[in-house]
C-alpha cells in the first residue's frame, strides 16, 4: 500500500448500494427480530449496513469492470486502448451472463430462496427474487434458537426444497434448517474466494455464476 505507483480503484463508486439484510437474531445480539445488527450494534436501529456484494449481480460486475478499465486507462494512457479492448470483451461476456439469468429465472415455481449468508440481495433484486438470510451479512454469525425456529417455520411456509450455503463457510446451520423441513442443502457461491480444487480446475467468476444459476433454477423449480 506504500507503493506510489499503486492504482487504487473504488470499484463500487457510482453504483447505488442497497441496505444489507441482517438476517436472523444472532447469539449475543439480544432479541430484536429481523432487525438485529452485527458487531454489538443490535440496539442501534439507525445504523445502516450497506451490502457490498454488487459483483453478484452481473450488471454490478459490469460496473466494476468499467471502473477498473477507466482507472487503468487513466494511470497508463499508453496502454489505454488495450485496457478498453479487454474490458469490452469481458463486458460482452457479462451481458451474455445477464441474459442467461434473466431467461433462466423467468418462470419458476418459487421466487423466495433461503441462504446462510445475505450476499445475494443485488442478484435477487435484479431478477425479481426474494432472499431470506439466516445469518445476515456476517456469514460466521450464529442465529439464536428462537430466530432459527422462525426461519424454519418460514421456510416451511414457502415449501422450500433447498437451503443454500457457501463453499468456504460451515454448512452446519443450513443442514439444521434443511433437516427440520425435510429439505436438502445446495451451494450458492458468493465468489469471495476459491478452493484449491476450484483454482486447479480453472474456475472463474463466469463459471461460478453459471453454476449458481443452475443451483438457483433447481431450488426454485424453474422451467
Question: For each predicted feature, which ranges?
Answer:
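Extracytoplasmic metal-acquisition and chelation regions
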Residues: 1-223
Amino acid at each position: 500500500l506504500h507503493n506510489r505507483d499503486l492504482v487504487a480503484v473504488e470499484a463500487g463508486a457510482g453504483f447505488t448500494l442497497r441496505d444489507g439484510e441482517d438476517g436472523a437474531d444472532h447469539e449475543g445480539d439480544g432479541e430484536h427480530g429481523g432487525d438485529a445488527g452485527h458487531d454489538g450494534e443490535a440496539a442501534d436501529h439507525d445504523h445502516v449496513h450497506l451490502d457490498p456484494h454488487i459483483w453478484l449481480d452481473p450488471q454490478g460486475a459490469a460496473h466494476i469492470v468499467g471502473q477498473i478499465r477507466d482507472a487503468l486507462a487513466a494511470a497508463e494512457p499508453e496502454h489505454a486502448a488495450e485496457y478498453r479492448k479487454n474490458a469490452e470483451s469481458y463486458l460482452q461476456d457479462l451481458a451474455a451472463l445477464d441474459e442467461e439469468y434473466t431467461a433462466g429465472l423467468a418462470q419458476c415455481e418459487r421466487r423466495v430462496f433461503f441462504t446462510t449468508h445475505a450476499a445475494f440481495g443485488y442478484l435477487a433484486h435484479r431478477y425479481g427474487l426474494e432472499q431470506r438470510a439466516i445469518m445476515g451479512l456476517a456469514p460466521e454469525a450464529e442465529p439464536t434458537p428462537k430466530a432459527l425456529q422462525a426461519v424454519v417455520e418460514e421456510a416451511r411456509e414457502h415449501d422450500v426444497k433447498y437451503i443454500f450455503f457457501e463453499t468456504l463457510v460451515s454448512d452446519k446451520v443450513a443442514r439444521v434448517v434443511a433437516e427440520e423441513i425435510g429439505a436438502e442443502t445446495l451451494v450458492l457461491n458468493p465468489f469471495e474466494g476459491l478452493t484449491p480444487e476450484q483454482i486447479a480446475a480453472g474456475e472463474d467468476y463466469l463459471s461460478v455464476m453459471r453454476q449458481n444459476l443452475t443451483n438457483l433454477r433447481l431450488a426454485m423449480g424453474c422451467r
